[in-house]
Regions:
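N-terminal Sec-pathway targeting helices
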Residues: 1-7
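A short, solvent-exposed, low-complexity linear motif enriched for acidic/polar residues
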Residues: 7-157
Length: 157
């Protein structure tokens, strides 16, 4: 009986520790709806204020940039403060008139500062991060296009 109580108490302690040491982060993307832009993101990472990168996702997800936020990924991470988001963009497609064209993204990596003091993740709660992309499309000649968006991120809850 005493052993059972000790085991239950230990398990409760582990659950409480995990609950208050980790929080959930949801990353949303939003863009300029003046033309259709689809990006495929193969990796999403957050940089911790205390140093080091936390991987949120390594699976490919395609989202359309619209004026309403689209969920890109959700993950459980250690509570703390985060200052930068990094997204690996494996492909981008833009609709220009009736034609879909592939656009390159310089370096394939978007390094996005988290403005207004960064992202604060508290144990046992959910923090939402919104990535705002102002797509800047440049014709590089011969039917080739480059997408070099102006991007920021901010905590919305």
């Amino acid at each position: 009986m005493v052993i059972a109580i000790v085991i239950v108490a230990a398990l409760a302690g582990v659950v409480l520790y995990y609950h208050y040491s980790y929080g959930t982060v949801e990353v949303y993307v939003q863009g300029d709806p003046s033309f259709a832009v689809y990006i495929t993101v193969s990796s999403v990472m957050l940089h911790s204020e205390s140093g080091g990168w936390i991987t949120l996702s390594n699976s490919s997800t395609t989202v359309q940039l619209t004026n309403s936020p689209q969920l890109l990924t959700s993950s459980t991470i250690p509570a703390g403060n985060y200052t930068e988001l990094r997204m690996v963009v494996s492909s981008a497609e833009v609709t220009i008139g009736p034609v879909n064209v592939t656009a390159s993204v310089p370096s394939g990596i978007l390094k996005i500062p988290i403005i207004k003091g960064g992202l604060h993740v508290t144990g046992g709660s959910t923090a939402k991060l919104e990535v705002l992309m102002g797509p800047h499309l440049v014709s590089t000649g011969n039917g080739q296009y480059m997408l070099s968006p102006v991007v920021t991120a901010e905590q919305i809850s």
